[in-house]
């Protein structure tokens, strides 16, 4: 563990306390094997994020977001050549192998898509809770609608137990930030 990882972990713990014992952290980019970031960011190692999370594993749980439309289109990760849904299963295995708790997957932009429903059933059979977040018309510009019962209010509330909730995804456009904001909105109401 490098000093930087320990400092980041301490800052996260401080933020957990600052925000009343619960922090939602949206992790963009790769959590491990981030060779691009290690090339362009001085001092950043390919596994810096993972090392920090391992240090926080007793306090953290992972939520993985995946866009239901990406499941339906069989969207493929260009770097490793597998579909986003298969990558969710891979990420669950990898995070779990490092002792990180993964008990939830959120299907974003959900509209009862057939392949998304099948994927939900597969996750349930593996003991993973599945939550649905629905498309919101005029998101994010119609703030009044977004924060109403017909916006974030219609999304499933994600049950969490740990003080640090890390929201991640197989790739961009999966809805990580929307899941984080929706979750904090639902928790407040």
Annotate each PLM feature.
Residues 4-132:
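Long, basic/Gly/Ser/Thr-rich N-terminal segments
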Residues 138-152:
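N-terminal pre-Walker A segment at the start of P-loop NTPase domains
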Residues 157-162:
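Phosphate-binding P-loop
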Residues 72-73, 112-115, 138-142, 174-175:
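Short, well-ordered, mixed-charge alpha-helical segments that flank or form enzyme active sites
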Residues 134-136:
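A short, structured active-site edge motif that brings together acidic residues
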Residues 1-5, 184-189:
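Conserved small/polar residues in nucleotide/adenosyl-binding loops
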Residues 21-23, 163, 179:
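Structural beta-strand/beta-sheet cores of well-ordered domains, especially the beta-sheet scaffolds
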Residues 165-185:
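Glycine-rich phosphate-binding P-loop
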């Amino acid at each position: 563990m490098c000093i930087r990882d320990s400092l980041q972990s301490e800052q996260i713990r401080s933020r957990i306390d600052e925000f009343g014992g619960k922090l939602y952290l949206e992790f963009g980019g790769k959590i491990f094997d981030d060779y691009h970031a290690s090339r362009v960011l001085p001092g950043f190692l390919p596994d810096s994020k993972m090392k920090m999370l391992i240090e926080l594993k007793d306090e953290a749980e992972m939520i993985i977001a995946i866009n239901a439309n990406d499941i339906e289109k069989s969207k493929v990760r260009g770097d490793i050549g597998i579909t986003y849904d298969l990558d969710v299963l891979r990420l669950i295995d990898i995070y779990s192998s490092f002792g990180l708790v993964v008990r939830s997957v959120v299907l974003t932009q959900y509209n009862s898509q057939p392949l998304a429903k099948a994927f939900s059933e597969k996750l349930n059979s593996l003991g993973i809770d599945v939550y649905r977040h629905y498309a919101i018309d005029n998101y994010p510009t119609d703030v009044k609608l977004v924060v109403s019962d017909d916006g974030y209010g219609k999304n499933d509330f994600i049950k969490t137990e740990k003080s640090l909730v890390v929201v991640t995804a197989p790739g961009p456009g999966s809805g990580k930030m929307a899941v984080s904001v929706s979750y904090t909105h639902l928790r407040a109401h």
